[in-house]
């Protein structure tokens, strides 16, 4: 009772202070230039991918439909997290209002959840293409692809609504300094002045269901693909089948290795500097590299790109 009264008398935090990626004055300007360049490059690359898919009929296939969704998602990723990162590097400490912080958290969780489900959908598409090629036109017809994409986005939205509501309803009485470059789950839970056991449980369960559930679904698809590829009679056929999956497998490996380490742990390891570095990988580096990874391994995208460059 006394604790409840004490908490009620405390002033609720109206804003948070983001420490940013680095507080070293001697490298902040250089980092700002680097990350601004990466931001613009990411937007350019993913916009180009979406344009190629929309403007070339030979890319109007399920695999590229999902790739277009992924490119859109990557653009949203950097647009949600990069502004506060850049402002922190430009101004030093960045003050973000409570509502803005929760809004950023909401959209970030939406994107993480959506990407998990979307990557699993892309793995299923490759599974059907290689393991059940005769049924591919039926199993991956446009209505199914659209449904999988909608499930991905709505699934991320649902998870985010639950998690963000739990975190936003906690009490934050001070201190209000977040050791991160954007509003993320773990730093916010560390600042709450109320019990967070229930919120941590919700966070952990959602991580298990979304991260591990989609990861295991993706891996099951690739195990089946691997078995099918090994049974193919010719080396050429095996190489062709594997090449259609290699890019996606690289993207999946990078994404899940980082996100599972950060979010799917039963106990938060106090290593925020490490978490910030890992967060940079999947919020900045991965969105920039994904279009390059897909273009380097995909001849159809390369042909479409060459045609576009020739027309221009």
UniProtKB/Swiss-Prot annotation:
Protein localization: Cell membrane
Bilayer-spanning residue ranges: 30-50, 70-90, 92-112, 142-162, 196-216, 242-262, 276-296
Gene3D superfamilies tied to this protein: Rhodopsin 7-helix transmembrane proteins
Family named by the database record: Belongs to the G-protein coupled receptor 1 family.
Molecular function GO terms recorded: G protein-coupled receptor activity; olfactory receptor activity
Membrane topology: Multi-pass membrane protein
Protein task: Odorant receptor.
Name by which UniProt lists this protein: Olfactory receptor 6Z7
Biological source species: Mus musculus
One Gene Ontology term, aspect cellular component: membrane
Domain of life assignment: Eukaryota
InterPro entries with a match to the protein in the record: GPCR_Rhodpsn, GPCR_Rhodpsn_7TM, Olfact_rcpt, Olfactory_GPCR1
GO biological processes: G protein-coupled receptor signaling pathway; sensory perception of smell
Transmembrane among keywords: yes
